[in-house]
């Protein structure tokens, strides 16, 4: 298995107010500082009549927020390369946003795929996992 990074997503449920875009930029900066990652660029877009997206391009990957005020949801995404743990963002986000619930998903980004392969039928998915295993068996061990 070749791991390239860690990825978390948070769905922040039950938000009742629409936050100013500057709040998200400050939170991204706080998360970047806590995770010890480098922000290269921040891009944002305000939708009409509501909603907002902000993404920070990092030297180590990205952080993003997408808001859905009409549904009371803020979606957060943090993908990091190397040994950086994106979970440092969780406590910051819990403190910064009013919410009733947060759904966290975390996973490694790697070559070992036991997830749904969108290009294969169920029968071929199993073949895909077997082929991947055979590739790793045939590769010389790296030390």
Model-inferred region functions:
Residues 80, 141-142:
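Ser/Thr-centric signal marking residues that sit
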């Amino acid at each position: 298995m070749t791991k390239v990074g860690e990825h978390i997503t948070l769905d922040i449920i039950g938000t009742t107010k629409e936050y100013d875009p500057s709040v998200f930029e400050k939170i991204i900066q706080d998360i970047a500082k806590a995770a010890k990652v480098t922000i290269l660029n921040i891009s944002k877009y305000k939708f009409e009549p509501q909603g907002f997206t902000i993404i920070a391009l990092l030297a180590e990957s990205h952080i993003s927020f997408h808001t859905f005020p009409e549904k009371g949801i803020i979606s957060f995404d943090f993908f990091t390369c190397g040994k950086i743990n994106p979970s440092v963002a969780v406590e910051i986000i819990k403190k910064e946003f009013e919410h009733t619930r947060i759904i966290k998903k975390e996973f490694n980004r790697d070559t070992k795929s036991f997830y749904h392969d969108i290009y294969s039928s169920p029968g071929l998915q199993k073949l895909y996992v077997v082929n991947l295993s055979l590739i790793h068996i045939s590769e010389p061990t790296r030390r």
